[in-house]
Each structure stands twice: as C-alpha cells, then as structure tokens.
Amino acid sequence: MKRLVLLALTVAAVGRLSAQTAVERVTTDLKYLADDRREGRGLGTAGLDSAGQYIAQQFARIGLTPAGPGGFFQPFTVDSTAPMALHMHIAGVHTRNVVGLIPGAGRLAGQVIVIGAHYDHLGYGGPFALDPESTGVVHNGADDNASGTTAVMEIARRLAQRHAANARTIVFVTFSGEEEGLLGSTYYAKHPVRPLDSTYAMINLDMVGRLAGRKLTIFGTATAREFPALLDSITTRDDMPFTGSGDGYGASDQETFYADSIPVLFFFSGMHPDYHKSTDDWQKIDFPGLVHIAEVASDVAWRLATRTGPLTLVEVPRPRSAMGGEGYGAYLGTIPDMSESPGGVRLSGVTPGSPAAQAGLQGGDILVQLGDQTIKNLYDMTDALRAHKPGEAVVVVYLRDGKRMETKATLGKRGG
C-alpha cells in the first residue's frame, strides 16, 4: 500500500512538473514573439523575419522535418493582384511562411493534417488598428496571433512524442500576411508542401490566449459530419467546455482551406477590448489556458491523424468578402462576440471612449441595424460601416434583453 501511495504521489508530481514546464515554454515563446523588438511583426519588417527565424529554430529543436523549398521557409512575394496589395502599399514585399512536418506512417501516411496559425500582426498600427491615436506605436499582437503561433509550436512538441503504426502526415505551418488578406495561407494553398487534395483536415489557431474561465469557441464544427461527436468526446475528457459554431468561413486562415473543400476547425478564445490595439500585450495572456487549448487541439489533431474512416465534407457557399480590398470603413468601437447570433451581431463589449461607448452600447447588445443597413451578420456590419464616413452620425438599432432600442453614434476614424 505504501508503495502505491508513493507511486501515486510521484505520478502527480511529474504531472505538475510537466504542466509547469509547458506553461514556462509557452510563456518564453510568446514573450519572444510579442516583444517590442519584433516591431509588431508587421509585414516586411525585420521583426517579422526575426519571429519567423525563431519559429524555424523551435521546429528544428522539436525534430520536425523541414518542408519548404528553403528549409523550414516557404518564401513568397506579395503580388500586385492581391486584394489589398495596392490599398496597403504592400505589392512586391518579400515574406515567408514557416513549414515543418511529422512524416506519417503505414497506410495513412499519404494523407495530411495541416495545423496552422498566422504569425504576423499590425506592426505600428495602420488602417486595421482600432486605436487611431496609437498609429506609430508598436502593436505587439500577443493574443493576435502570437498566442496561436505559440500553440502551434506546443502542439508540435506534443505530437512529436506520439507514434502509431498508421498515422497521417502532420504539416505545421505559420502563415505570414494574414492581416493583409490571408496572403500566406493563400500562397500555401497554391503551393502546398503535400498535394492539397490529400489534406484530410486543417486546424487553425487564432487568438487563443484569453481563455481565463471563458468557454473556448471552435468554428467549423459543421464542416464535417463527424466533427461534433469527435469534439464532444475529446473536450469532455480534457475538461474543456466549448461552443461549436458553423461553417469554415471567417476572417482567418482556415477559410482558405475550406474554400478548397477541406474540413476545418478554428480554435478561438474570444474577442476582447485590446483586439487590434497597442494594448494587446503578453501581460494579459492566460498562459495556463493557452496550454490547455494546445493540449485539447493536440488530442483533436491526433484523433484526426489516426482515425481510419473518411471525413464527410459539408459545403456551403462562400459568403461575400467582408473586406472587398477596401478596409473596414468608419470606426464604431464595438467588440463582436464571434459565436453565431441569429438575427444580428451580438457584442461582447465596446471599447471605452469609443463612439459605441458614447452612444450607450454595451456587451450583450445585439446590433440589428446601422443607418439604413439591416445587420444580420458581421459581413452586413462591415458593409454598413464602409458605407459611412468618419464624423457621420448614424442611428444604431439594437436588442437589449429582448427589447428593441435605438441610439445615435457619431462614427470615428480608424488608425492609418
């Protein structure tokens, strides 16, 4: 009996040590990526190149096989025909994805699981920043998306230790140019390191650093019929409550793969007031929560890598682009709840001091109309903002506790 007690205590201690080590690892990784010296990982900066070099070094230490034409790097140049190339003055910029893989085994080795995250951010602000007063200040993007990049590295460490007689090849890729219109994932889809038609599923991690007691959101749960049951079994075992949400479209890199008829999952810990602001710093990251998400994503990835049956793709038409290559439009300062909200856009909060805050909007409100535009989803909301200019006063219609209300907001100007 004494020996059993000692064994149990030893196992518990090892578990605690392992968990602590993981927290230390992700803290080190994320703090490097979100350091001021990375220059906000803006496209074309030396800071972004430095971040890519760090990721490649970690891939090498983990033991991944280099998968790009330049070792771990997949370089590309932003084409002038890219949707936002001219608007953002980025045509001709040289950048690179970082790609490594774990070779598969047995009869499943020819199929591929892609696990990805974008590692770029806004640099020193610009037209997509939501704090116009901070243009020229480093936007470190700790949550967006140093957190997802860090999670990809941690998942790679975990999966590199797993083995099976039959397993799909697992490709890990961190994408550049996501903020400018999914440039890195689009380039990868056109130049995959393994044939795209052999890709079984894609897992994307974007903004996974602010769990802090909230439910994880997993988008794309309806892109394969088998996903809901698979996710329920793993998240229940791993004690990770989650909210499943819809198709595979949305403003992150999984959209590129879903548009190519690949089932996708997108892990997301939620919006917050620091989104696309210079205040998105490492001190606000929930590191134990980030480790927990990486653990769950690892288990999901391994189940997908080793299951024998096919996935049944569920396709829906691609919605119109919410960007159209012209930016987001005037500034309101709402923080949308990215989970589905039929009949409008539910807010998780508003930015203090913003036009939305001054108009009395608050978290939990559901926006249903902006000016003359009916709002059913985020695409409608973006279109409505693009239809107005900074300084215009618009009527905002919203639901609060089921009651239809309206207010007037004077729209502001975005950074740039």
Predicted features by range, described:
Residues L4-A12:
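Sec-dependent N-terminal signal peptides
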Residues R41-P103:
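A non-catalytic alpha/beta surface segment that caps or lines the substrate-entry region
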Residues Q20-G44, L48, G52:
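Mature N-terminal segment immediately following signal peptide/propeptide cleavage
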Residues P273-P317:
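His/Asp/Glu-rich mid-to-C-terminal helical/loop segments that flank catalytic regions of hydrolases
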Residues R107, F175-H272, D286-L290:
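Metal-dependent peptidase/peptidase-like ectodomains
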Residues V98-G100, A109-Q111, I115-H121, G125-L182, ...:
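Alpha-helical metal-binding/catalytic segments enriched in His/Glu/Asp
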Residues R307-G416:
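C-terminal recognition in membrane/secretory proteostasis and scaffolding
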Residues D36-A46, A85-H89, E133-N145, Q161, ...:
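Second-shell loop/turn segments in exported
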